[in-house]
Structure formats: structure tokens, C-alpha cells
A protein has these predicted regions:
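Positively charged n-region of N-terminal signal peptides that target proteins for export
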Residues: 1-5
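C-terminal motif of bacterial Sec signal peptides marking the signal peptidase cleavage site
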Residues: 15-17
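Bacterial signal peptide processing site
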Residues: 19-21
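Central antiparallel beta-sheet cores of small beta-barrel/beta-sandwich binding domains
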Residues: 27-92, 123-197
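Short, structured interface segments
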Residues: 95-122, 204-230
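N-terminal "domain-start" segment that seeds a small globular fold
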Residues: 221-257
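Short active-site neighborhood of thiol/selenol oxidoreductases, capturing the structured segment around
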Residues: 254-279, 284, 297-298
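Structural microenvironment flanking redox-active thiols in thiol-disulfide oxidoreductases
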Residues: 279-311
Length: 311
């Protein structure tokens, strides 16, 4: 259950500052590093980082990139785009060390290292199944289904874990003996998957964020599906309509009443804690522009922040 949350109603969808990675050219300047967020003694999520003057460009595998502007002298500090996440770094003889931390959570801090060099994602020679139907073992006897989905981008292994409420966004990986590893870091969500594959069966482990962990097992099944989201969410039988008064981004109150709408309307429940809300926001913004006023889109943002200004 979320505590101390604030609801923000916004008519327009925000655009986000993640982008496709730009290929480096021979004329590129600055320094390249292998960045690592250390989840525990034996697990780290690594990624490429480029430092150009006071700007760090993080590369989430081969699928997206984002920038963090640094300030300070002895201790460099920066804020990640979109999400309530910051970092600090100090220079050492062979790179930088510091912390990644969330500003909307107490004591959510993980060691962050930048070591000179660069990661190379080798092409994956094996043909893994495109989809595995897995069972996640979440502890205390709790088991939940998911789909581990794999693909190749320019020959490099990419994937995600999809559940009935979303997925783990973009992960990039490589083969290891007997299976594969996937990693992803987008400024907020930190994932590592280690899997062993034998014929059509799979088993493995997932580390998420600072303390998240579960094991899984499953079988290859390209036709497997999850619970229909339209059956998961519906208006309660004792409610006749949807109505709210909420503050908009400009501070004015926005009143919505489903009984008065005159065009197709999308209500998007979102927040910076949601892995897929950024991707959904891009899609909804595209829809809104393409239909040129023929639809309405409302973003209802729930945040952990203690104040409206911070949210």
C-alpha cells in the first residue's frame, strides 16, 4: 500500500528525455566508462557511460540513452531525468565512485562505480525461444505467472519480463555457458536476470533494485498469454460514473465527470514508480497528436512525494 501519496491530474501528457543511443564517431571526445550499480556482494548491473564536459550519458544496453548533468567540484552531483533519482561521484585514480540513490525513499542507496573502458555486446549465436512461460517464486509460498520474452537486435540478445500489469522495460544481454544474462538500468529501475536453458525448459534468478529478488522456472511457449487486463480493471457495480476534482500541472483544479464526455477519453494511471508509464506516456502523446483533438487524454499521477511541489 502506498503511503503519503499525492494525486496529480494532468491534461497533457509529458514527453520524456530518453532517446535511442547515438552511435559514437571517431571524432567523439570525452571519456568512456563502464558504469556499475552494485546490488549485493555478487551481483551488479553494468552499462556504458560517456562523460563529455559536465554531462554523463548513460546507455541502457543498446536500446536507449539518457543524460545526467553534473555540478560541483570535489563531489559531483546529478539528477536523473523523469525519475526521483540522484547520484554523487568523487574522482579516484582510475575512474569515479559514489552512490545512486532515490530521493523519494528513505535509505535507498546503492554503490555506483565508473571504471575506464566500454562494454561490448557480442552477437548471440544461439537461438533461444522467443518466449518462455515462467512461474515466479516470490517467497512465502507466493507464485505468480509471467512471460520472459527474448529477441535479437542487430544480433544482440534483448528481452524483458512481462506480467499482467506491465514489464521490466528494456534489458540487453549476452550468452553465458548454459544460458544467458540480461541487465537493464534506465535511471530508476535496476534489473539483472541470470537464466539457465536446457532444451525447452528454463530456470533462473532476477535481482531488482536494492532488495528485490525472486527465482523462476518455466517452459518455452510462444503462444502463452497473461490475464486479460480488461478483465482486471472495471468500474465497481455500486458506482455509476467516474468523477474527480484534482490539481493540474498549472495549479488549477481540473474537474472530470464521465457523464459529460463527448469524445473517446483515456484515463492513464501513472507515476515515477511505474516502469512502463514513461513508454505509455510516449504512446499516448503520439495518439493525442495524431487524432488532433478527437480524443482526450488525462494522466492521473500518484506519487510517494510528501508535497505537491516535489511530486
Amino acid at each position: 500500500n502506498m503511503k503519503n501519496f499525492i494525486i496529480i491530474g494532468a491534461i497533457s501528457m509529458a514527453l520524456f528525455s530518453c532517446s535511442q543511443p547515438e552511435p559514437k564517431t571517431e571524432a567523439a571526445t570525452g571519456q568512456d566508462f563502464i558504469g556499475s550499480i552494485i546490488q549485493n556482494d555478487s551481483t551488479r548491473v553494468s552499462f556504458n557511460v560517456h562523460l563529455e564536459e559536465n554531462t554523463l550519458t548513460f546507455y541502457n544496453g543498446i536500446q536507449e540513452s539518457f543524460e545526467v548533468v553534473l555540478s560541483g567540484e570535489d563531489t559531483l552531483r546529478g539528477t536523473f531525468p523523469v525519475f526521483a533519482s540522484d547520484l554523487w561521484l568523487v574522482a579516484k585514480e582510475d575512474g569515479f565512485e559514489g552512490e545512486y540513490y532515490r530521493t523519494d525513499a528513505n535509505n535507498y542507496r546503492l554503490p555506483l562505480e565508473l571504471a575506464p573502458g566500454g562494454m561490448t555486446y557480442e552477437q548471440s549465436p544461439s537461438e533461444f525461444s522467443g518466449q518462455y512461460a515462467i512461474t515466479r517464486y516470490l517467497g512465502e509460498g507466493i507464485e505468480k505467472p509471467a512471460l520472459l520474452q527474448l529477441d535479437k537486435k542487430d544480433g544482440v540478445l534483448v528481452g524483458t519480463i512481462a506480467t499482467s500489469t506491465g514489464d521490466s522495460r528494456f534489458m540487453t544481454g549476452y550468452e553465458v555457458e548454459g544460458g544467458f544474462e540480461l541487465m537493464g538500468f534506465d535511471g530508476r529501475f535496476i534489473y539483472k536476470v541470470r537464466a539457465t536453458v536446457s532444451d525447452s525448459t528454463i530456470e533462473g534468478h532476477v535481482w531488482a533494485g536494492m532488495t528485490g529478488y525472486y527465482s523462476f522456472s518455466g517452459i518455452a511457449d510462444d503462444n502463452a498469454t497473461l490475464e486479460d487486463p480488461e478483465e482486471m480493471s472495471s468500474l465497481r457495480e455500486d458506482y455509476t460514473h467516474i468523477e474527480w476534482h484534482l490539481p493540474g500541472l498549472d495549479g488549477d483544479t481540473v474537474h472530470f465527470d464521465s457523464r459529460t464526455i463527448t469524445k473517446p477519453t483515456i484515463l492513464a494511471i501513472q507515476g515515477s514508480w511505474c516502469p512502463n508509464c514513461m513508454d505509455e506516456g510516449r504512446v499516448l502523446d503520439q495518439y493525442y497528436r495524431e487524432f488532433e483533438g478527437a480524443i482526450d487524454v488525462f494522466g492521473l499521477s500518484y506519487e510517494y512525494s510528501g508535497t505537491l511541489e516535489k511530486a
